[in-house]
Amino acid sequence: MKLWGRSLRFETTPEDLRAFTKNDEPVAIVLWHNRLFLSAEIVRRYRQGRPAHALVSASQDGAWLSAFFSLAGMRTVRGSSSRLGREAATALVEVLRAGNDIGITPDGPRGPCYDFKPGALIVTRRTRTPLLLIGAEFESAWQLRSWDRFYLPKPFSRVRMRCRHVPATELQDRDAATAAISAQLHEINPDRISAVGLNKPGL
């Protein structure tokens, strides 16, 4: 799994690279559920290996994601962005206060795909933690027949990475922040494969 991720050729603009790396403080990495495959490489390449904990569904459906993150060298907190339980919220707060990053998929764990749930901002608003919104456009990838059409970029293919930094001061109004962040995530995540790529939704 690690070798697969490291074979990918990430491309980014200087502006996006600055957004990825400008914060020495803990951040919440926010990306759509179908781009989770990239999460470990994002942490390794752009967050200087800072420990990161991913929020994963407490249901049986989240078991495979926990296994994936374990193989990728990341830890998990069981819960969901739609119904963030007290134990999961407390655990994420502790992770941030220990100086580590957290990862959140605002449309997880069961969708609908690209539906930003306000619960995703509970912990970041409470701890005044900035966000890193992640975008990815794949040159060549497979897609699974899952609710989110999960992307599996082909080994050695190019991935065009985007990033937007959202300071904690912009999260105070929950409804306004949810709408603005959702719009930005849609903007930096075009749902298309490059013309030279091959999309196989039948996997």
What are these regions (language model features)?
Residues 11-15, 57, 79-82, 164-166, ...:
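Conserved beta-strand termini and adjacent loop/short-helix elements that scaffold enzyme active sites
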Residues 2-6, 71, 75, 86-203:
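Non-catalytic C-terminal accessory region of glycerolipid acyltransferases
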Residues 15, 19, 44, 48, ...:
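Polar/charged alpha-helical tracts
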Residues 15-16, 39-43, 65-69, 94-98, ...:
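Short amphipathic alpha-helical segments, especially helix-boundary/capping motifs
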Residues 2-26, 38-39, 44:
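A short, well-structured juxtamembrane/interface segment
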Residues 25-83, 143:
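Catalytic core of membrane glycerolipid acyltransferases/transacylases, capturing the structured
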Residues 16-18, 35, 60, 110, ...:
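Residues that cap or initiate secondary-structure elements
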Residues 17-21, 66, 120-121:
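Short amphipathic alpha-helical segments and helix-helix/interface helices
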